[in-house]
Curated annotation (Swiss-Prot):
One Gene Ontology term, aspect cellular component: cytoplasm
GO MF annotations in UniProt: ATP binding; ligase activity, forming carbon-nitrogen bonds; tRNA binding
Biological process, per Gene Ontology: tRNA modification
Protein name: tRNA(Met) cytidine acetate ligase
Gene label: tmcAL
List of residues binding ATP: 7-20, 101, 162, 187-188
Top-rank taxon, per record: Bacteria
Protein's cellular compartments: Cytoplasm
The UniProt record lists the keyword Chloroplast: no
EC annotation from Swiss-Prot or TrEMBL: 6.3.4.-
Keywords in alphabetical order: ATP-binding, Cytoplasm, Ligase, Nucleotide-binding, RNA-binding, tRNA processing, tRNA-binding
Matches recorded under Gene3D superfamilies: HUPs (3.40.50.620)
Catalytic reaction annotation: cytidine(34) in elongator tRNA(Met) + acetate + ATP = N(4)-acetylcytidine(34) in elongator tRNA(Met) + AMP + diphosphate
Record's function text: Catalyzes the formation of N(4)-acetylcytidine (ac(4)C) at the wobble position of elongator tRNA(Met), using acetate and ATP as substrates. First activates an acetate ion to form acetyladenylate (Ac-AMP) and then transfers the acetyl group to tRNA to form ac(4)C34.
């Protein structure tokens, strides 16, 4: 069976995602679609609106055959680490082809960009360091260094989210020496961060904004997604946003010694002082974020730092986990086709499959981190509901889609 790998967040799953999944499967001639999905916290440092289980079901309802989780040590990371973790897991599941959405739908420019960057990596790193000394953020320093090196060459710009991720998928495949073909599918209409909500195709950013404003989003998402969102809101009386976690972050920053705060992943250059000082003038998470943000510290970097603060994740812990790569594959859900694929190929997978949360304890620091992060996600719930969800996480089996439909 030819397995297609997709790297996703589905926050939430919308019509643009459905188009990508359908077209990617058709374009690659795949027999099985494997989605590796961020779990509770996402690449840009945001809590997922809905739990991994609801989002996994959205994917299965739309045609994914296997949904597995991208561990926290890779999901709340730079594009490079994010891509490396995802590609490693897809390779472990014997995916022979990876597909991602892009503005032009052409893969050749991504390979050309990867080749150019391989040839100029030393000079690129040097220029990035020089620009960082000027006090700009890492993304801006990278974009400026790339612009300086590329000159008049017709290369993909490295200042668009989909280009950055696509480039890093190709780079990860090459760096890890994996036998996997990278392909890309043309994105339709809405851009990655478009904030306007109009028509059947809207960005996840616009859909989240509409959802949190109480607007109807049914024209922009599959019917099953809309039903699951309503079910989630009725059950938990929230969609997870940073505002729900603000009191816990306040407590953490105000009661933790500065020397300990400085050990948090993404916290460097005395940022712990800025976090505490700006907190005194903030009455909301957004107020705190605005007061802390600067030319050097972008919203994305700060949000990742906040995720690490909330979950007690240190730079040392992440480095230790990443050093040996993903240790297991956490299975969230499967279709009948996915189940058949696992049965026929399980012995050749290069990583073990985990089907219950309790099994994570076998995987040392990586497993313990995931257990902690999973519990932190439910902190906004009232005490009794929090206890129920933490218990439920240990009882939850992978979703068997046909049996639920």
């Amino acid at each position: 069976m030819r397995a297609l790998g997709l790297v996703v967040e589905y926050n939430p799953f919308h019509n643009g995602h459905l188009h990508h999944l359908t077209q990617a499967k058709q374009q690659t001639g795949a027999d099985v679609v494997v989605a590796v999905m961020s779990g509770t916290f996402l690449q840009r440092g945001e809590p997922a609106l809905l739990s991994r289980w609801y989002r996994a079901e959205m994917a299965l309802a739309a045609g994914a055959d296997l949904v597995v989780e991208l561990p926290y040590a890779y999901s709340v990371q730079t594009a490079e680490r994010f891509a490396e973790g995802a590609v490693t897991i897809l390779a472990a599941l014997r995916c022979s082809v990876l597909n991602f959405g892009s503005e032009k739908g052409e893969i050749a420019p991504f390979y050309a960009l990867a080749e150019f960057m391989n040839d100029h990596q030393v000079a690129f790193n040097h220029h990035v360091k020089q620009f960082l000394k000027d006090g700009v953020s890492y993304p801006k320093a990278s974009a400026q260094a790339f612009s300086m090196l590329s000159g008049h060459e017709k290369l993909l710009p490295l200042d668009q989210p989909n280009n950055i991720l696509g480039y890093h998928y190709v780079k990860a495949i090459q760096r890890l020496g994996i036998s996997m073909e990278a392909t890309t599918t043309l994105r339709i209409q809405a851009g990655y961060h478009d904030k306007e909500f109009a028509g059947p195709i809207a960005s996840a950013t616009a859909i989240r904004k509409a959802l949190l404003s109480g607007e109807n989003i049914e024209t922009a998402v599959p019917a099953h997604t809309a039903r699951l969102i309503q079910m989630y809101k009725r059950r938990y009386r929230l969609l997870h946003t940073w505002e729900h976690y603000f009191p816990f972050l306040q407590h953490k920053v105000l009661t933790t010694p500065l020397a300990e705060l400085a050990k948090t992943a993404e916290c460097s250059e005395g940022l712990e002082h800025r976090l505490r000082d700006s907190l005194f003038s903030a009455s909301s998470f957004q107020g705190w974020l605005s007061a802390t943000k600067s030319k050097r510290y972008t919203q994305t970097r700060l949000q990742r730092l906040f995720a690490h603060l909330l979950t007690g994740t240190t730079a040392e812990e992440n480095a230790a986990i990443q050093q040996s790569g993903p240790a297991y594959i956490r299975l969230l859900g499967m279709s009948e086709t996915g189940k058949t694929y696992i049965r026929e190929n399980k012995k050749t997978f290069s990583l073990p499959i985990v089907t219950r949360q309790g099994e994570l304890r076998r995987y040392g620091q990586a497993g313990e981190q995931e257990l902690r992060i999973s519990q932190c996600y439910w902190l906004p719930l009232p005490p009794q509901a929090l206890k129920q969800e933490v218990t439920r996480e240990f009882q939850q089996k992978p979703i068997n889609w046909e049996k639920r439909s």
